[in-house]
Amino acid sequence: MVRCVYSIRLYEHLKKFCQDRMYPLQLQETDYGHPAQKNEVSHINLTKFLNGLGCPFDLRDYQYNAVSHGIQNKRAILLSPTGSGKSFIIYNLLRWYINNFDKKILIVVPTTSLVEQMHKDFTDYGFDPELVHKIYSGKDKTTDKQIIISTWQSIYKFSKEWFEDFGCVFGDEVHL
């Protein structure tokens, strides 16, 4: 079971914070829209897309619901127990993102072993490992590849400009 929490709560808190203090709040439009906008999800089209990925595994209902929730809400925190297929959820979300947008994707994990595990999982799902770049100690930090898996420790000192190339960020192991 995946529990889907956060959709636009941070935006709503920020909006109230600014209103209470009479601060101006300006939303900057991007290709992905702003936090209050939602994507329409056609379950027929999404199912057709996901089935067409050629994965050797089928999404379980709770995984499909998490993918659908993430797409519809554009941002979310998905709470899921160990062994429930979080990497597979991330994989399906990133495949949808690649299909719909042309920006890089950053996946941030807490350890180098999880960088390697996520990379291996994507390969097991049928994804070309040459399309994914891994960043951690001792690895090259520059790449033209669209998907980057990294530890937060390897990138947190990077300049703001480095992050501007990313249209989508996934974090594994988020603690509230």
Describe these PLM feature segments:
Residues 152-154, 161-176:
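SF2 helicase catalytic motif II
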Residues 33-79:
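Conserved pre-motif I regulatory segment
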Residues 103-111:
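Conserved RecA-like ASCE P-loop NTPase motor core of nucleic-acid helicases/translocases
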Residues 1-32:
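N-terminal accessory nucleic-acid engagement/regulatory domains that precede
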Residues 72-97:
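Walker A/P-loop
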Residues 112-136:
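Conserved helix-turn-beta segment of the N-terminal RecA-like "Helicase ATP-binding" lobe
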Residues 97-104, 126-129:
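Post-Walker A helix-loop "phosphate-sensing" segment adjacent to the P-loop in P-loop NTPases
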Residues 137-148:
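Conserved motor-coupling elements within RecA-like helicase/translocase cores
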